Amino acid sequence: EASSEGVPVMAVSLETKAEDIMATSSESVGFGKATEATKLWIGRVLEEVYEKKNEAYRFLNINIPAGDIDVKGYRMTFVENQNYYVLRRPPERDWSKPYCLSFSIDVDEEKLHRGSDIQTVCQDRLISVTPITMDMTRNTLSRF
């Protein structure tokens, strides 16, 4: 919604273990470097979009490796064509009660493409910054 109103957008994710994905506590997941990196990118996005008129920075997907990383170390990336999360088959259960789907993180590292978002985070341990566009059809339509 923000993007459709002309407001710059950042989707920021921190690499975590599957069992910690729903954690909101900094005790189980270290949010310190992710917070630092997010602050840095907020400033960069505002400067690029509003001062330099660089539209490529209007909508970014930012993925941050876990651990003690250099928050200034990043790569502009593209979306990898394999899944990072794999849903697990749910057990038999009472369908009248809420259930949280479980998943595993399953990356085929040998099939990763150099410069992709997953490869950059998982192998090179750099922040992945992927420009996203809301207009995903303009270029494709010209091929029909």
Predicted regions and their residues:
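Glycine-rich phosphate/pyrophosphate-binding loops
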Residues: 3-26, 30
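Short acidic/Ser/Thr-enriched loop-to-helix initiation segments
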Residues: 22-23, 29-48
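C-terminal accessory domains and tails appended to enzymatic cores
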Residues: 29, 46-144
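Secondary-structure boundary elements
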Residues: 3-10, 44-54
